[in-house]
Amino acid sequence: MSDFYQDFNKRRTFAIISHPDAGKTTVTEKLLLFGGAIQLAGTVKGRKADRHATSDWMEMEKERGISITTSVMQFVHNQHVINLLDTPGHEDFSEDTYRTLTAVDSALMVIDVAKGVEERTVKLMEVCRLRDTPIMTFINKLDREGREPIDLLDEVESVLGIQCAPITWPVGMGKRFKGIYHRYQDIIYLYQQGSNAKKIDATQIKGLDNPQLDELIGDSAKELREEIELVRGASNEFNLQDYLAGKMTPVYFGSAINNFGIKELLDDFVEYAPGPQPRATQERVVSPNEETFSGFVFKIQANMDPKHRDRIAFVRVCSGSYKKGMKLSHLRIGKEVQISNALTFMAGDRSHTELALAGDIIGLHNHGTIRIGDTFTQGEQLKFTGIPNFAPELFRLVRLRDPLKSKALLKGLIELSEEGATQVFRPLNSNQLILGAVGILQFDVVAHRLKYEYKVDCIYESVNIACARWVYSDDDKAMSEFRTKAYDYLALDGGDMLMYLAPTKVNLTMAEERYPKIKFCATREH
């Protein structure tokens, strides 16, 4: 095994964030292509054939062409091990994406050159700002007409509140797209169209003033020199410390579908992006260079392999190393478990791993005992913080078409809620089951998966609930009185936590005023 495999400093764990259709899945594919992880990139147009994008492996994702669940892919580039966490491209899955961003050390933001900064990008950026996550930016689709690069940089700076430092710069765009200029290497990479081969041998011209440039691209050379002169005066120079502090984003331009500009991005990413970072727990800060193992569960995925009906808990390794057969303490349930079959990931292709270090993501087989937010250590009592759960904003009543399937329905809903795909509530005053979600598409996913994975067909009806809040109190007497008086509005969630289901926002406000000793919470830590 190569030395760099055994060095946690050589790990780079990141996620890609973007608005839907900015080309995130294509960028993911091309990073894997350059990392040697796949030979042929499955394009969006190829979805009707058997060739689907590697990271979109769930049946419903293949039908719709959007990434619904977070995939984990590991590949090697320039003697570094890269863990890429693909996040859902659809806005309804912000919760899953939010939790994924707690498991990474940096992020790559993909922006469509024609559309600029879009709403979802703004939301995801806010999440990254909470943890000062370092961010690189890739402005995509330069093979199409779009907005002026300098205007895009201004927009990123003003809307997202982060300084931009352009590393590469486009030579034209759309039909006039001739290539990119790497400002720090002083090399022009000339554009060649074509999406499947690795274009490592693209024509390179050393030096902005090289007369060969004028011969090959004509008047575009003069335009480029003038633009670069402007850029030097108007933009920020790259500062590594500002990038690592989350204050500056290095910016790259290219066309992912044509493999162009990706290699330059990947080379710099490996060099500049941070390795595994220290992590906060309730007890202390855990450093990645500690010898003993620690990690937390940020995602649970059911039925990654429909043939085996299995569930996998995704664990971010924070310190130490996982070795096959080691014993770990599962702290929430107070049990020691032997882990002999952890998995690493290449989208849906899973392989058993012998070793995982800080920064790596491993998959543990889960038979219903592991939940999102659980901590695993070699005995020390730790609880990693900052893994959020959000109160849902949309609700549906679930009714079975076949009443004899109630056991299968409850099992399916509890498993799907443990994944974080949806939340399930059981009102105290009835046998009803109510689904809660952050976005409307989540209901479609649950209906689809209940039908095909659990063989349960249901009717989903609207229900008179406007919002939900977790309720707590340090005063047992006040809580007991509240449970009695508000009984008809209370329900248990999938983890048996008490929730208040308010029929209107006014009702919630009145309840908060009437019961001042009760805390009504829209988020909670896992």
Curated annotation (Swiss-Prot):
Pfam family, any one: RF3_C
GO cellular component terms attached to this protein's record: cytosol
InterPro entries hit by this protein: EF-G-like_DII, EFG_III/V, G_TR_CS, P-loop_NTPase, PrfC, RF3_C, RF3_dom_3_sf, RF3_GTP-bd
One Gene Ontology biological process: regulation of translational termination
A GO MF term: GTP binding
Residues at which GTP binds: 18-25, 86-90, 140-143
Keyword terms of this UniProt record: Cytoplasm, GTP-binding, Nucleotide-binding, Protein biosynthesis
Domain tr-type G: 9-277
Chief location bin: cytoplasm
Subcellular location: Cytoplasm
Described function: Increases the formation of ribosomal termination complexes and stimulates activities of RF-1 and RF-2. It binds guanine nucleotides and has strong preference for UGA stop codons. It may interact directly with the ribosome. The stimulation of RF-1 and RF-2 is significantly reduced by GTP and GDP, but not by GMP.
Membership in a protein family: Belongs to the TRAFAC class translation factor GTPase superfamily. Classic translation factor GTPase family. PrfC subfamily.
NCBIfam families assigned to the protein according to its UniProt record, in alphabetical order: prfC, PRK00741.1, small_GTP
Protein name from the UniProt record: Peptide chain release factor 3
